[in-house]
């Protein structure tokens, strides 16, 4: 029986390789304040964005912390990502010999609404490159933050797209 790679059929190979390259670049430069700390992935509902990203992250040896539309993603929750100095590695890996990095996935980001007050603005502050003196004093994450959404022209998403890779 022949095997067929669905990613080849869907023409995702270039996207996958590009994403892996960006993740590698992030890991090599995460201590720098001038890098973008987030990625925005978008596509039609049900097209497999979340599954694709989760599979790539597992392949790259990441533990994944997911926040989706059913979670509260307001300002205080987003700031918790950095204020409590979230480790670069999972606590469980301390007991194992192989270290696993952490990646934060904000799924259905275009679904952040009034209940998530201040969430988008806090996320922007965490992921944007720190260029000015004021920005350099802001909190940031040593973990990559991947935002997944259905739309790339959405009003709420416009500002965050300016600060992250897509």
Question: For the regions a protein language model found, what residue spans apply to each?
Answer:
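Non-catalytic interfacial helical region
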Residues: 68-166
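A detector of helix-start/N-cap boundary segments at the beginnings of structured domains
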Residues: 4-9, 41, 65, 166
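Acidic, Ser/Thr-rich intrinsically disordered and amphipathic helical segments
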Residues: 14, 18-21, 51-55, 77-80, ...
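Active-site catalytic pocket residues across diverse enzymes, especially alpha/beta-hydrolases
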Residues: 26, 60, 127-130
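Walker A/P-loop
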Residues: 36-67
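Pre-Walker A (pre-P-loop) alpha-helix and adjacent loop at the N terminus of AAA/AAA+ ATPase modules
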Residues: 2-37, 88-91
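Pre-Walker A (Motif I) flank of P-loop NTPase domains
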Residues: 33-41, 100, 143
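Beta-strand elements of modular eukaryotic interaction domains
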Residues: 26, 30-31, 55-56, 92-96, ...
């Amino acid at each position: 029986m022949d095997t067929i790679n669905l990613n080849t059929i869907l023409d995702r190979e270039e996207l996958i390789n590009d994403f892996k390259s960006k993740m590698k670049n992030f890991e090599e430069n995460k201590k720098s304040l001038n890098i973008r700390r987030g990625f925005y992935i978008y596509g039609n509902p049900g097209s497999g964005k979340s599954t694709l990203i989760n599979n790539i992250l597992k392949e790259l040896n990441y533990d994944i912390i997911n926040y989706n539309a059913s979670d509260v993603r307001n300002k205080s929750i987003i700031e918790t990502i950095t204020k409590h100095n979230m480790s670069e590695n999972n606590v469980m890996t301390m007991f194992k010999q192989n270290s696993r990095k952490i990646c934060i996935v904000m799924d259905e980001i275009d679904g952040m609404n009034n209940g998530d007050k201040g969430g988008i603005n806090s996320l922007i502050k965490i992921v944007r490159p720190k260029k000015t003196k004021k920005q350099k004093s802001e909190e940031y994450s040593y973990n990559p933050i991947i935002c997944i959404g259905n739309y790339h022209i959405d009003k709420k998403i416009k500002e965050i797209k300016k600060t992250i890779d897509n």
